[in-house]
Amino acid sequence: PYGEDALRAIARHREMRRGKGFETIERPRDIGGLMLPESGLPRCALLECLTTLCANEMFTTGGITDPSEKIIQGIKKLAAQTEKLVIVTNEVADDGIEYPAETMDYIRIMSRLNSRVAALADTVTECVCGIPLTLKGELK
């Protein structure tokens, strides 16, 4: 997380989750290397946000790389440590605007990554104006 905007967003998200039993682990890259803390409770994890993770992996190496496989393998490792993994992502390709090449690369990679994550998921729910629309499986 870089810059004041990112730090404010993190603080806002932490405040929203205060007192709700969440343990926040900041991991801007390499989620495959994350080992979740042991607990006696059923384990649920929230990965927020796939779009930010992808950008962090793509643009922090000094050049643009496609991090899709690294992220998918990381998601599989994280899912193996939990009973339920919830992933927050964003639809980044629906505005129809042509952006500079680097941004278009990101949009294409995110579109493919979202498709791959949806294929792995038991349930896919899109929220439109706060209204959940289940696209795959059953919302529980």
Which residues make up each language-model segment?
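Short, basic/glycine-rich phosphate-binding loops at helix/coil junctions
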Residues: A11-E15, A45-F59, A93
